[in-house]
UniProtKB/Swiss-Prot annotation:
Gene Ontology process terms (BP): male mating behavior; ovarian follicle development; regulation of DNA-templated transcription
Annotated region described as Disordered, given as residue ranges: 1-31, 152-171, 207-289
Biased composition (Polar residues): 217-242, 269-289
Comp. bias intervals (Low complexity): 20-31
Main location: nucleus
UniProt note: phenotype after gene disruption: Mutant animals are viable and fertile, with no obvious anatomical defects. Ovaries from mutant females may have an elevated number of polyovular follicles. 25% of mutant males consistently exhibit copulatory behavior toward other males.
GO molecular function, one term: sequence-specific double-stranded DNA binding
Start-end of DNA-binding region: 86-133
Biased composition (Basic and acidic residues): 1-13, 207-216
Name of the protein: Doublesex- and mab-3-related transcription factor A1
GO cellular component, one term: nucleus
Length: 490
């Protein structure tokens, strides 16, 4: 309530002062003084609301507002919002704008009664705003569901008059919330509908499940009938009895040819198993998931590869020929006959050098090669003289073993004076006839896969000559092989 110029208060509660006609300019000067006396910062664009309201009320009474309040009155007339102020600062007698003021408020941590009341009020107002938002969201969802429900009910009335059994629209089918609402409505009004909504959806889902099952069975039957029609032309037909006859004929034809690799396995194992109790039949979950085709393809591929691999007979002579390509076919055949067709035993015999005695043809051929090899019988290997096995030679103790290995001395026409065979040299362990210091692949002649030829005559023709004053341990430099000078080479 404001005090009027005559000292009376307005009992009506308004701000309309009773002024005399001669004093029309007095409120203007008073307004100027009041407006200039209020401490307002330069950032404020408008004066306080109380002052604006009092000025507006005085303007309605016929008092012209001052020139400084034209902007404020224009802002109020245009409907600009009021600038929010900090409540904590207002409680302590300071007016400050709230925008950007939260961090810099000097009373933000104040715990007085007024500030505590303000904090509690802000908390309650925030809870009210959150509650209103939640209620508005629930109302909007309920409106949408009611709209869908009304559309479904209108569609059900139209289709019931036409004789159709489906009463739901596509939108209702796609919305789970609408499904719940429709189910609740059906339970509330049991007499209005004979079939509940959830049963209709279950029927649709079951129909969708049965479609891939039928497709899978049809594809299996078509794949089953193709190979059967090629082999059994007399059982072709369109009826189900003919199809079963074809399947039985195909199954009976499979065990008749177990060794052939051209047997066609059925891609549908349920037809071959003969029932659901068999371990190879697929379960309903496999059929629904659609993975039985991939599993059947992998299973058929592995079974076909195994059948083709196991059905091919292995030739033991061919196996020996691949393992020992340097051996002659007749020799390998004789070893295999001696071992009674056992490939493993024949390989062990060849590797251990315990072959049977060669026949007369092999002996004659070995004698010819041995005679040709006599020209180059004197050679040095890794610094050890094999040509003249005297008492000073390092291999002189091996001469006593020549009688024990006499049967093997003619293999590949190796020199009998060496007292060991090339096979025994190549495949012997370090603890046997040799002490392991001779490499089995120093020369091509020692490799069992290659025939031993007298190539020493022209391997190193006269490149290195042995001096007469050098001992035998300096005959080879770097493990190379060369000739010892004798009467033929001089």
């Amino acid at each position: 309530m404001e005090r009027l110029p005559h000292g009376r208060r307005d009992r009506s509660g308004g701000c309309r002062p009773h002024l005399a006609p001669g004093r029309a300019a007095a409120p203007a000067s008073a307004a100027r003084s009041v407006s200039s006396g209020i401490p307002v910062s330069a950032t404020f664009l408008r004066p306080p609301g109380l002052f604006l309201r009092s000025t507006a009320s005085s303007g309605r009474a016929g008092c012209a507002p001052g020139p400084g309040l034209d902007r404020a009155l224009g802002a109020v007339g245009c409907g600009y919002p009021r600038t929010p102020k900090c409540a904590r600062c207002r409680n302590h007698g300071v007016v400050s704008a709230l925008k950007g003021h939260k961090r810099f408020c000097r009373w933000r941590d104040c715990a007085c009664a007024k500030c505590t009341l303000i904090a509690e009020r802000q908390r309650v107002m925030a809870a009210q705003v959150a509650l209103r938002r939640q209620q508005a969201q629930e109302e909007s969802e309920a409106r949408g569901l009611h709209r869908l429900l009304y559309q479904g009910s209108s569609g059900s009335g139209a289709q019931a008059s036409g004789g159709s059994g489906r009463t739901e629209s596509p939108q209702v089918l796609n919305n789970p919330m609408a499904v719940a609402v429709l189910g609740a409505g059906a339970s509330r009004h049991p007499g209005s509908r004979s079939v509940p909504t959830f049963e209709v959806f279950q029927q649709d889902y079951a129909d969708r499940k049965q479609e891939p099952k039928q497709r899978n069975c049809e594809s299996c039957q078509s794949r089953q009938e193709e190979p059967v029609s090629n082999t059994h032309h007399h059982s072709l037909g369109s009826s189900k009895g003919n199809v079963t006859v074809e399947k039985q004929g195909f199954m009976s034809s499979i065990p008749e040819h177990p060794d052939k690799s051209t047997i066609i396995l059925s891609p549908c194992p349920t037809d071959q198993s003969g029932g659901e109790d068999s371990p190879r039949s697929f379960s309903s979950s496999d059929l629904e998931s659609g993975n039985e085709s991939e599993w059947a393809r992998d299973y058929i591929a592995t079974r076909a590869s195994l059948s083709t691999v196991t059905s091919r007979p292995r030739d033991p002579l061919g196996i020996l020929t691949r393992i020992f390509p340097g051996y002659k076919h007749s020799r390998l055949e004789g070893i295999l006959q001696f071992c009674k067709g056992d490939v493993v035993q024949a390989i062990e015999q060849i590797l251990n050098g315990r072959e049977h005695k060669p026949d007369c043809r092999d002996l004659a051929r070995a004698d010819l090669e041995n005679a040709a090899f006599q020209r180059a019988s004197d050679f040095s290997l890794a610094g050890i003289g094999f040509g003249t096995l005297s008492n000073k030679s390092a291999l002189s103790p091996l001469e006593a073993a020549s009688a024990a290995y006499g049967g093997d001395s003619t293999l590949y026409s190796f020199n009998p004076r060496l007292a060991f065979s090339p096979l025994r040299l190549a495949y012997s362990s370090p603890g046997r006839a040799l002490s392991g210091f001779v490499s089995p692949y120093l020369t091509p002649g020692l490799v069992p896969a290659l025939p031993f030829r007298p190539t020493l005559d022209y391997a190193f023709p006269g490149m290195i000559r042995e001096p007469s004053h050098l001992p035998s341990k300096h005959l080879v430099a770097g493990g190379r092989l060369y000739f010892r000078p004798n009467q033929e080479h001089l």
